[in-house]
Amino acid sequence: PAVNQNSSIKDVIVEITQKRLGLTAVLDENDTLKGVITDGDLRRMLEKGNDILNTTAKDIMGIHPKTIEGDALAVDALDRMRKNNITQLIVTEDKHYAGVIHLHDLIREGII
């Protein structure tokens, strides 16, 4: 799941909902990773009463997403997830978005 940093909140919600991972990467025009938005970020935005119609992805994204390079070992992904108490990592290749790896992917592949 990925959206442009200038995407509307509606587009962010649709992307997160359709991809069913609870997050979306936020990219610039060159597909460079700029941040991440989780379903929790959306809930916090709503709690604050932000103007949804005039808010964009870059306004609410976390700017330090947890990432892993595409050529990393699965065991390294698992270790990073455990250390950060998270279930997903954004996969990058040379700072460009390549996808998301979820804990369930590691379970399905027999890593854990």
Give residue ranges: language-model regions.
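Bateman (tandem CBS) regulatory domains
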Residues: 54-65
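Histidine- and/or cysteine-centered catalytic micro-motif in compact active-site loops
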Residues: 29-31
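Conserved active-site beta-strand-loop modules that form the wall/rim of enzyme catalytic pockets
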Residues: 21-25, 34-35
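Short hydrophobic beta-strand segments in globular cytosolic domains
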Residues: 33-34, 92, 97-98
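The conserved cystathionine-beta-synthase
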Residues: 3-20, 27, 46, 67-87, ...
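Nucleotide-binding motor/catalytic cores of P-loop/tubulin-like NTPases across gene-expression machines
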Residues: 35, 39-41, 50, 54
